[in-house]
């Protein structure tokens, strides 16, 4: 999982990407292609 400053470009990389908030952190998760997993904060 990568840590990025901005998830703006990360969420449009694939159509299966979803933005999720967990415990004050923002994640981009992708069930179909897990290599797109990103975390912010």
Swiss-Prot record:
> Which PROSITE patterns does the protein's record reference?
RIBOSOMAL_L36
Q: What's the protein here called?
A: Large ribosomal subunit protein bL36
Matching NCBIfam families: PRK00831.1, rpmJ_bact
One family name in Pfam for this protein: Ribosomal_L36
Keyword Ribosomal protein applies: yes
Query: GO:BP terms for this protein?
Result: translation
**Keywords in alphabetical order:** Ribonucleoprotein, Ribosomal protein
**Which family does the record assign?**
Belongs to the bacterial ribosomal protein bL36 family.
Sorted alphabetically, which SUPFAM superfamilies does this protein's record hold? Ribosomal protein L36 (SSF57840)
Q: Which GO terms describe its cellular component?
A: ribonucleoprotein complex; ribosome
Drop me one GO molecular function for this one: structural constituent of ribosome
Q: Does the keyword Heme apply?
A: no
């Amino acid at each position: 999982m990568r840590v990025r400053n901005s998830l703006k470009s990360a969420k449009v990389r694939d159509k299966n990407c979803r933005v999720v908030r967990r415990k004050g952190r923002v994640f981009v998760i992708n069930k179909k292609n897990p290599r797109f997993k990103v975390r912010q904060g």
